[in-house]
């Protein structure tokens, strides 16, 4: 199976059909993945608000979107290299469950708190940074490491979720464009966002 990345630059506006409310979750779900009987720490942004004025090394922030049967942790080796070699700053991760109603028989692009919504965007620490992650490997309660086929959801739902991440990154950074980098299915999610937003 070949895997490849797409690179898109997007300047799509802020129009949104519905107001997005970020779903609360226990704090430990943001920082750890619970898999089988093990606990794995997740990449976490270092709060830079008090220590310095953030100065981006890039003209536009990058949003990394993982592929099918994967998670945002896919990007750790590459971004750790960027951090050490280019002093990039990790801005945070957007955790989105794409099967929030836990019903595989229906599908929609509605967001929490709408009744029967398939998509839940979870509250997470996001700051001004050079790059961000989108993570679809999320359960309806906000824990990372899905058991509800969130990763395998329709590309249309992934595109709607990418839109939320793009809008929030643009709001946090003050930039009018972002760079989307998607691996495999993440490239299709990026294309869906660009073509249908």
Place the predicted regions along the sequence by residue.
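N-terminal non-catalytic accessory region
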Residues: 16-181, 185-197
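Sec/Tat signal peptide C-region and signal peptidase I cleavage site
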Residues: 11-15
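Bacterial N-terminal signal peptides
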Residues: 2-10
